[in-house]
Amino acid sequence: MAKEKYVIQAELETKGVLSNAREAQREINNIGRLAKETNKNAQITGSVTMKDKGIKETQRALNLAKQNVDNLTKALANAKMSGATQKQVQALESQLVKAQTQATRLSTELAKVGSEKGTGLSGAVDKMKSAGGSLLGTFSKVGNVVSGISSAIGLVSGGISKAVDLTSGFANTLMDTYDKQIQAQKTLSTTLSDGAKGYEQFNGHIDKGNSLLKSQKTDLNELGATISSYMKVSGDEAFKTVNAINAVGDSLGLGMDTQKQFTYGLAQALGSGTLHAQDFNQMMQSALGAQFRDMLIQAANEMQNVGMTAEQLPDALKKGKVEADLLANTFGDNWASKMAKAQTSLKGIEVSTGGVKRMLKDGQLSVQDFTNVFGDGFTSSLLNAMNTTSDGAVTMENFKDKMEDGVFSTEVMNRAIELFQQKGEKLASSGPSTWAQIREMISNGFNTSALDGFRKGLGDTGLDMSSMGNNATEMSSIVGSKLGQMAGQAVGALTKIIDKNKDGKVSNEEMEGAVNDAKDAVTNFFNKINFTSIQGFLGKIGNAIDELVRFYNWANDAYGAVQNLLSASRQVGGNTGLIGKALGFRKNSTWGDAFSDFHWLTSNIDPLGLKENQGLGQKLLGSRNGQIPLDLQFFAGGREAINKAVDAVQPYARASKGTTATSSIGTQDNSKQDIKIYVQSSADGQRIAKEIYNKLERNGVKLNKR
């Protein structure tokens, strides 16, 4: 039988350049050699993808950016002295702002790795190195702690990977979330006009929101940081803008990546003071851009006091000022027949096309009536048609010409932002509009909750990112490896047939077979646990003995859960053997008796003499009054998530944070669609589930609640 290998992946994630790539690669190689000396079955892997060339190229780009700033500064001065037009001066000022921003970002990129402390995980690594630690050696401990412990919830994370599009490993996702949140916090705190106070206010609005808003906290912080990096705003102002982008984007069914792309273009435009084609094209990559374009048109016409606005349209309809011919030219000659059909359905009596035209003339048709027939774009399309004949008004047809003329100034864009915020406030309570969005929000909720649990867990034990040491590395390697075996077997049996036909559906027969295979795999794993293997396990775990007990406890609970799923009451015969005696179990206890409420630190039985041997106790537990160095529950949102992890192999029990047996919402008749949502039974999970249920039910979707 082949010997088991323990694999530690040592990675260096910089999002940019490395200050000394050769040294980093040497560290990886040294770790590998040391591991082989310690345990010939250990295998350390790692690679540096950014070589020294990266820093040289960045330095070269910075020099060019600085040169560009100097040239533009001189050009601007010459333009002002030579009597250039206002448009020419504004264009140069805009280019200068962008060049300065680019130079600042490049300069920050170069300085970040070498000088900044505490910025994301890379900052934590720098901090550890400055304290005398080994760069990659310490980083591998941090990464391996997360990787090893995440193996303990392999069933949880594996079970939801298909459902919520978690494309990368849980440990990497957690660290990415951590880095993003730390970076956003640093940027917001330093760029908001009210600093750290503004950061607290910004996140205070999020914390007061619903569960779905909270689930996007990290992404919203990133949006806020983008806005505050380009323009002077307070925490409250930044949140209003970000909330509007998020609410309008959600209503359009757009994901966070698309919202970030729009925000970047908007921030550049606001920062330069005038809207230019490059920024506008960036914003127009999605439907968000079209929405904001309508706001810009309305704002420009308002400030010039020309044309008609969206606020004035309802009154114009009420007073019968909208002509039937205008509607025909804008929406087609059959507009009246479409409206007649809708009014007949609404009123329950026959309404003719002639009747519709009389209703229009008498002011009996509202904006909502037209929106119901012609969609959300009705208002902007009609206003554009009406304003085409208004002298000096901005329309979709002349938008680019007006943009080149500098019509969309800072004042106009700020007014457009206000209108955008008003639209966002109306939409904020409606929540997601597509199933893909719901999946994304569940995923974000899982990642955000995992990070909150990670930070709380570290704080509870008196640890920080820079103090994870050899104990944790050894514990996570060994415990993670053992747990990973079981998790891999159980989840592997199920995921083989998940979405087999690529249609998002799994038949009952296929699911039943997969569940039985998975249950057998878990059962077989526990049947193989015996004194010999655990004894070797104990010898290797060393100072992490308490984590072994927690593993054993968790394993027993998982075993019990499998037995319950099988509707059997089979117990492990006889006593628990020598390992049970060593850990203080009653002589003839079953696994269920031994682990139901047992914890050796609080038990009267002290098999290892910790209470008598204070030196050994101090060595094992440190100075934290018995608190556990690391807890397997950090990343699973609570003890019950780990204890019931095996539920992930049972699709009709509770999986973790959402599993769907249907394809997307919106392509079928929702009133006849049967959707099942499974959410982990934590408080946050239940709140998220409830909001999703309510949202879907309001839209006529039939649900099976479990």
From Swiss-Prot:
Domain EF-hand, first and last residues per copy: 271-290, 361-380, 496-521
Which domain of life does the protein's organism represent? Viruses
Per the UniProt entry, what is one GO biological process? viral tail assembly
Q: Which GO terms describe its molecular function?
A: calcium ion binding
- Show the SUPFAM superfamilies listed in the entry: EF-hand
Q: Where does Ca(2+) bind?
A: D499, N501, D503, K505, E510
Query: Where are the annotated coiled coils located?
Result: 9-113
Keywords assigned by UniProt, alphabetized = Calcium, Coiled coil, Metal-binding, Repeat, Viral release from host cell, Viral tail assembly
Q: Which InterPro entries match?
A: EF-hand-dom_pair, EF_Hand_1_Ca_BS, EF_hand_dom, Tape_meas_N
Query: What does the sequence similarity comment in the record state about its family?
Result: Belongs to the Mulikevirus tape measure protein family.
> What does this protein's UniProt record list under function?
Serves as a base for tail tube protein polymerization and acts as a template for tail length determination.
Specify the protein name: Probable tape measure protein
Species name:
Lactococcus phage c2
